[in-house]
């Protein structure tokens, strides 16, 4: 499975450097000089990192295949991806890679079927996007109080939603 580790933003300067919106907890491992990253759309890459640096909390990256600002502008919005097989296992049993959660069935603590995890959003609060009946979607804050059990081996997530949460998506 391919996982997004970054999204290319606008060019920085005239020599082909781009800003990268980092979408990984370990950018120091993902954005290493010499590493070739696959892309989405796939026909744009792979892109080989020749330089990277932090500037005002932004990651700036230069790719071998991008000689100037014009070429860099063409990459705006392209996703940088890695194969999930490259990821090391997590040490904390309460941490999960997004791809481990997507596709799990969701049920309440009472055993009522709710739907399936279709995405994980990383905003101020991590949210599970749960697709329910008739295509409805509900956002469930990914906190222990509301998600007391994640059993990837059994393929399920148990939620304890407050009154009204599940009705928001219907």
Swiss-Prot record:
Record-linked InterPro entries: PRC_barrel-like_sf, PRC_RimM, RimM, RimM_N, RimM_N_sf, Transl_B-barrel_sf
Xref: SUPFAM superfamilies: PRC-barrel domain, Translation proteins
One biological process term in Gene Ontology: ribosomal small subunit biogenesis
Superkingdom of this protein's organism: Bacteria
Location in the cell: Cytoplasm
Molecular function terms, GO-annotated: ribosome binding
Gene3D superfamilies registered for this protein in UniProt: PRC-barrel domain, RimM
UniProt key word rRNA processing: yes
Domain PRC barrel: 93-165
GO cellular component: cytoplasm; ribosome
Key word Zinc present: no
Keywords linked to the UniProt accession: Chaperone, Cytoplasm, Ribosome biogenesis, rRNA processing
Family label: Belongs to the RimM family.
NCBIfam families: 16S_RimM
Subunit comment: Binds ribosomal protein uS19.
Notes concerning its domains: The PRC barrel domain binds ribosomal protein uS19.
PANTHER family from the UniProt entry: RIBOSOME MATURATION FACTOR RIMM
Described purpose of this protein according to its UniProt entry: An accessory protein needed during the final step in the assembly of 30S ribosomal subunit, possibly for assembly of the head region. Essential for efficient processing of 16S rRNA. May be needed both before and after RbfA during the maturation of 16S rRNA. It has affinity for free ribosomal 30S subunits but not for 70S ribosomes.
Protein known as: Ribosome maturation factor RimM
């Amino acid at each position: 499975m391919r996982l997004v580790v970054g999204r290319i933003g606008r060019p920085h300067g005239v020599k082909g450097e781009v800003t990268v919106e980092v979408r990984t907890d370990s950018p120091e491992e993902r954005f290493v000089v010499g590493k070739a990253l696959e892309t989405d759309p796939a026909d744009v890459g792979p892109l080989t990192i020749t330089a990277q640096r932090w500037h005002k909390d932004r990651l700036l990256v230069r790719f071998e295949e991008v000689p100037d600002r014009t070429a860099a502008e063409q990459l705006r919005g392209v996703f940088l991806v890695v194969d999930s097989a490259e990821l090391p296992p997590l040490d904390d049993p309460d941490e999960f890679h997004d791809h481990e959660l997507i596709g799990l069935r969701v049920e309440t603590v009472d055993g009522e079927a709710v739907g399936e995890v279709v995405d994980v959003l990383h905003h101020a609060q991590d949210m599970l996007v749960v697709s329910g009946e008739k295509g409805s979607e509900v956002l469930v804050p990914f906190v222990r109080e509301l998600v007391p059990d994640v059993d990837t081996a059994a393929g399920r997530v148990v939620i304890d939603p407050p009154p009204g949460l599940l009705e928001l998506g219907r």
